[in-house]
Amino acid sequence: MRHKNTLQKGSVRYIIFKEADVWYGVALEFNIVEEGDNPIKVMASLFEAIQGYVETARKLKMRPMPLNQKSDKEYEQLWDKLEEAKTLSKQEEVFSFGYTPFRDIAAAC
């Protein structure tokens, strides 16, 4: 099986969204979830967690599988819905979504 993400390069889909009074940040391929009361802080925390995850994988010379996990069905459905709409105006509970490449994560914060 050929993996999209490798230790050298790749990208991660992410979603920053609100449920009730809590903001969540999800990195789909890594199954990382961050939460907080501010979407910008949640996004920064999520990107920091992604960067740490990739750095640890590289340091341990892991196989690509942990960088290409199957994401939770709930988040996949939300991603598909957002991709279909391609607009945030209809999705008020979503602050941001997209792809972030491994190499540019630190610069995105």
What name fits each language-model region?
Residues 1-12, 44-109:
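Short, charged, surface-exposed hinge/linker loops at domain edges
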